[in-house]
Amino acid sequence: APRSVDWREKGYVTPVKDQGQCGSCWAFSTTGALEGQHFRTKGKLVSLSEQNLVDCSRPEGNQGCNGGLMDQAFQYVQDNGGIDSEESYPYTAKDDEDCRYKAEYNAANDTGFVDIPQGHERALMKAVASVGPVSVAIDAGHSSFQFYQSGIYYEPDCSSEDLDHGVLVVGYGFEGGKKYWIVKNSWGEKWGDKGYIYMAKDRKNHCGIATAASYPLV
């Protein structure tokens, strides 16, 4: 795998979004991975609907604004035969509506998902290099994460098991001798480094970045 990769430069990544006061990070991680794979196969970058996932993937085990898993959302897209565009099914940051999916606005699909071997940063690196942006879950429960602004994030108290936030790895690189993952968050562009965080890479699966990583098959 190359020493550095940044899928933003290749057109795979939509602008940073904002989940608001709703525990729907899992939906944003899911759409991010699907947007990348749709671009890889179709050559078009289309923003996909998180609200579609929030409202409609309860049968797969997701809980709207109270949390969910990216794999269950990938499963929903497969079960449902697609996901609507952001434009046709806009985000409300609420989960009190019934499913409003409409097949005519279907903008992407998947045929399942691949889980990266648990805790293997090298396998994650290979996947990011060959496939594109990958969904990951991390421990984001520290104030150092909430208030991150720049630099390579390393939190001594970070857990590799207690994961509470779904995000998207869009690449990796190094600065001096320090390696990092390029991570797209869903807290708006004002958070972090223009909405992104650069997280320590190859430091014993820091914050669990490779503990629950996956991507959709398209």
Swiss-Prot record:
Membrane topology per record: Peripheral membrane protein
Q: What is this protein called?
A: Procathepsin L
What's a BP term from Gene Ontology annotated to this protein? protein autoprocessing
Chain sites annotated for binding Zn(2+) 5: 139, 142
Please name the CDD domains in this protein's record: Peptidase_C1A
**What GO CC annotations are associated with the protein?**
apical plasma membrane; chromaffin granule; extracellular space; lysosome
Gene3D superfamilies per the record? Cysteine proteinases (3.90.70.10)
Known Pfam families for this protein?
A: Peptidase_C1
Q: Where primarily located?
A: other
Q: Which residues bind Zn(2+) 7?
A: 164
Chain sites annotated for binding Zn(2+) 1: 9
